Amino acid sequence: RTAARLIAEGEIPPLVLAMPSDGLWGDGSGYFSHHGKDFDRWIVDEVPAAAREAGAPVSDSSPCFIAGLSMGGFGALSLGARFGGKFQAISAHSSVTDLRELDKVVEESLVSELCRGEDVEVLQMILKHRETLPPTRFDCGLDDRLLGANRELHRSLEKEGIEHVYEEFSGGHEWSYWERHLEDTLRFFAEHL
């Protein structure tokens, strides 16, 4: 409804939204290669291909953006950094910024499985891929248990001179917060067409 309203009001252009859940064999398991498989490529390559195959009015040359919330915020920031050439911009809400924080937002942590030989911190992935990093924004609620980690990511990016947008708003780690701030993501994407 949010995107449809913003399109109808002329605030953003028409677009196709594909919103997968990462839940392969557990929360966060779709954001990395592991067990000898490139599971991270399914969001980067297969979701856009599936949208095209489903008849969405998009082509291989259509702009593609990545966004997420909570664990999906980790996915958006990390995949967006690692595969910067695939995305026009990145947006994230209430993000896990380090896989070792996963216990704060999921019931069954897979940290020991997910952290084998991979970068586990968003900051390290952004630093490693800073030359190809798309325009990036992220936000967090003032009552969110991940606020400190999001502030730290913001401070570290500022210290490293990496351009980004960071905002804080009232609210916590909850759907009402994310629903309110989806508009910020869509407007940010519209600015980067």
Question: Where do the PLM segments sit?
Answer:
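Non-catalytic cap/lid and distal C-terminal segments of serine-dependent acyl enzymes
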Residues: 1-193
